[in-house]
From Swiss-Prot:
Keywords: ATP-binding, GTP-binding, Nucleotide-binding. Displays ATPase and GTPase activities. This is Nucleotide-binding protein Sfum_2066. GO terms for molecular function: ATP binding; GTP binding. Pfam families: PapZ_C, RapZ-like_N. The keyword Endoplasmic reticulum does not apply. The lineage of its organism: Bacteria, Pseudomonadati, Thermodesulfobacteriota, Syntrophobacteria, Syntrophobacterales. InterPro entries: P-loop_NTPase (IPR027417), RapZ-like (IPR005337), RapZ-like_N (IPR053930), RapZ_C (IPR053931). GTP binds at residues 59-62. ATP binds at residues 8-15. Belongs to the RapZ-like family. PANTHER family: RNASE ADAPTER PROTEIN RAPZ. It comes from the Bacteria. The keyword Transmembrane helix does not apply.
Length: 286
């Protein structure tokens, strides 16, 4: 049984994530009281054997969550359950803007507190849980559709026999580092097609830009050597029980060089029969 706990900061996209898992045929429950979790999983195994994938949305609205989750998660692990924690977050100003747009009340807010204080309070309360997360996703630069697509790509092929799911991500340094990245490539040393007038308004998915970037010896050598490094490291990650690996390639704007490199690295890994998703985070920002 594959169990995913979706949690994180209020306003960071938990409901969107749960809907994405629902579309992937996960059995989904939002705000299940944490003390009921062991009993619920035991019931599924006993009376609902067709349920193999479960996604649970849990946050501070469930009052006993912060008090009970650590012991309950530990007990479940010792009982042999395989589960992971996805922690969603975003910058404080992003969360403020989202709450202002929806006019919803933050669950940690009171009539005497400001929204920003409620966000800081929740962030501090969830700090320990964040440190236990299997995956941390910063949704600040993602639209609702992009977050849903990211989860769909990552989990659509995951089953009980899957060893490692790999995501190769392109991004622009000018928009910030991707917090979910396990490894980051800085490819700003490569020749930049942005300064070629015929290529400036294209992106790295186009044949024209890809061919131009890959024409340089430095590019080809980098792709070959970094790909070889990953092929050596991935079996070690699998041996340690890692289930998800995010490799990020960054250039200045996230439109040209990083996109080409991400596609090539993903191709190298696919050639060796690894399941790989590619996500170009900042294409829409340029």
């Amino acid at each position: 049984m594959h169990v995913v706990v979706v949690t994180g900061l209020s306003g960071s996209g938990k409901s969107t994530a749960i809907k994405a898992f629902e579309d992937l045929d996960y059995f989904c429950i939002d705000n299940l009281p944490v003390p009921m979790l062991p009993e619920f999983l035991a019931l599924c195994e006993k009376d609902m054997p067709d349920i193999h994938k479960i996604a649970l949305g849990i946050d501070i609205r469930e009052r006993k969550f912060l008090k009970d989750y650590a012991k309950i998660f530990q007990d479940l692990e010792e009982s042999g359950y395989r589960f992971e924690i996805i922690f969603l977050e975003a910058a404080t100003d992003t969360l403020q803007r989202r709450y202002s747009q929806t006019r919803r009340v933050h669950p940690a807010a009171s009539s005497q507190s400001l929204l920003v204080d409620a966000i800081h309070q929740e962030r501090e309360q969830l700090r320990a849980l964040r440190s236990r997360a299997t995956r941390i996703i910063d949704t600040g630069t993602l639209s609702v559709h992009q977050l849903k697509a990211m989860i769909t790509r990552t989990y659509s092929m995951i089953g009980d026999t899957e060893l490692l799911s790999i995501q190769v991500l392109s991004f622009g340094f000018k928009y910030g580092l991707p917090f979910e990245a396990d490894m980051v490539m800085d490819v700003r040393f490569l020749p930049n097609p942005y300064f070629v007038e015929a290529l400036k308004n294209l992106d790295g998915r186009s044949e024209e830009v890809s061919s131009w970037v890959l024409r340089w010896t430095a590019t080809r050598e980098f792709v070959e050597e970094y790909g070889a490094l990953l092929l050596k490291l991935i079996p070690l990650y699998i041996r340690e029980g890692k289930r998800y690996l995010t490799v990020a390639a960054g250039c200045t704007g996230g439109k040209h060089r990083s996109v080409v490199i991400a596609e090539r690295i993903a191709g190298t890994l696919r050639d060796h029969n690894y399941f790989v998703n590619v996500f170009h985070r900042d294409l829409h920002l340029e």
